[in-house]
Amino acid sequence: MNKKELFDAFDGFSQNLMVTLAEIEAMKKQVQSLVEENTILRLENTKLRERLSHLEHETVAKNPSKQRKDHLEGIYDEGFHICNFFYGQRRENDEECMFCRELLDRK
């Protein structure tokens, strides 16, 4: 193997390493994004569990249908969907959801 072939082989190897490094950086960013999303979801889950525990321990004697509606209103006011389409998902920027509002406005 002469010097030119050796140099070309190293150059090709270097190019492959650069491509691999770029792919690894992209995967690293994706994993970081997933970890951040996972952390947010864990915090939301913890908050929902605390809220559920709090509601289960309340011993307020209310009309059962009124109590259910109040419970749904509380969840909605905390920024979560209560409609069948997106139940439990966080409302982005606490924007109104027409499906959730329809449920809350029922008599």
From Swiss-Prot:
One of its GO terms (biological process) is DNA replication. It comes from the Bacteria. Zn(2+) binds at residues 81, 83, 97, 100. Disulfide bonds: none annotated. It is found in: Cytoplasm, Nucleoid. Its cofactor is Zn(2+). Keywords: Cytoplasm, DNA replication, DNA replication inhibitor, Metal-binding, Zinc. The keyword Coiled coil does not apply. Homotetramer. Interacts with both DnaA and DnaN, acting as a bridge between these two proteins. Belongs to the YabA family. Involved in control of chromosome replication initiation. Inhibits the cooperative binding of DnaA to the oriC region, thus negatively regulating initiation of chromosome replication. Inhibits the ability of DnaA-ATP to form a helix on DNA; does not disassemble preformed DnaA-DNA helices. Decreases the residence time of DnaA on the chromosome at its binding sites (oriC, replication forks and promoter-binding sites). Tethers DnaA to the replication machinery via the DNA polymerase beta sliding clamp subunit (dnaN). This is Replication initiation control protein YabA. It comes from Streptococcus pyogenes serotype M1.
